[in-house]
Design a protein with these regions (language model features):
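Walker B beta-strand of ABC/ABC-like P-loop ATPase nucleotide-binding domains
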Residues: 1-4
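C-terminal engagement/docking regions of AAA+ P-loop ATPases
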Residues: 131-218
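Alpha-helical structural signal
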Residues: 13, 37, 60-61, 77, ...
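Alpha-helix N-cap and coil->helix boundary residues
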Residues: 55, 76, 113, 117, ...
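Conserved AAA+ ATPase small/helical "lid" subdomain
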Residues: 92-147
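Canonical AAA+ ATPase core
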Residues: 7-8, 12-15, 20-97, 102-112, ...
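Short acidic/histidine-centered micro-motifs embedded in hydrophobic/aromatic stretches
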Residues: 19, 83, 125, 170-174, ...
Length: 218
């Protein structure tokens, strides 16, 4: 867990590249494989800029998704107050899954069927990020792989054994937004990114049919 990761120096941030990609760390010439399951979760404060450093593109590309939390709703705010009213709820945490169950779940996504049409849909979306006039840095091949993985996981959570175009569309923003560099940023970057991504999605034809793992049209 990297809290406010953009406060780390570029040298410290670069040290994460090996463990994020290769699941290993090298110290003084000695390489150690990291135990599984392993993942990197980081937070970033977009408001404060003093004492912060921009995250390099190579590091951003290794984060599967980026989610903006925003402020809690009224209901969520009340629930937070209730939980912290008497004691810190973090003091009473129970595991919800074993290590083996997590590893098995991580392996299951690769079994989710993806039709040729959906694969082409993913690639066309990614290619559009490289051709859009407002984008100076488009999505890399690693980003297209991340979009595929996220769509497969989305299908699992929705109770299906195949990926639909909607799974892909719903994952475009969290998977691709942080991988894109806009040419001219005037005002709020987030708003401009949303507009650009919407333009890309509207410009790529959606496959007319989803095909399940047994070959049935749906």
């Amino acid at each position: 867990l990297g809290d406010e990761i953009n406060r780390a120096t570029p040298r410290t941030q670069s040290s994460l590249l090996e463990c994020m990609e290769e699941r290993q760390v090298t110290v003084d010439g000695n390489t150690r494989t990291l135990d599984q399951p392993f993942m990197v979760v980081a937070t970033q404060n977009p408001v404060e800029t003093q004492g912060t450093f921009p995250l390099p593109e190579a590091q951003l590309d290794r984060f599967l998704i980026k989610i903006e939390m925003g402020y809690p709703t009224t209901t969520e705010g009340i629930e937070i107050l209730k939980r912290f009213k008497q004691q810190n709820p973090l003091l009473d945490i129970e595991p919800v899954a074993t290590k083996e169950e997590i590893i098995e779940a991580q392996q299951n996504y690769s079994k989710i069927f993806v039709s040729e049409d959906v694969l082409q849909y993913i690639i066309k979306i990614v290619e559009m990020t490289r051709q859009h006039n407002d984008i100076v840095l488009g999505v890399s091949p690693r980003g297209s792989q991340a979009l595929l993985k996220a769509a497969q996981v989305c299908a699992i959570l929705r109770g299906r054994d195949y990926v639909s175009p909607d799974d892909v569309k719903d994952m475009v923003k969290p998977v691709l937004a942080h991988r894109i560099m806009l040419r001219n940023v005037m005002g709020k970057r987030e708003g401009q990114l949303n507009i650009v991504l919407e333009q890309i999605l509207k410009g790529v034809p959606v496959p007319s049919e989803a095909i399940s793992s047994n070959g049935d049209n749906l």
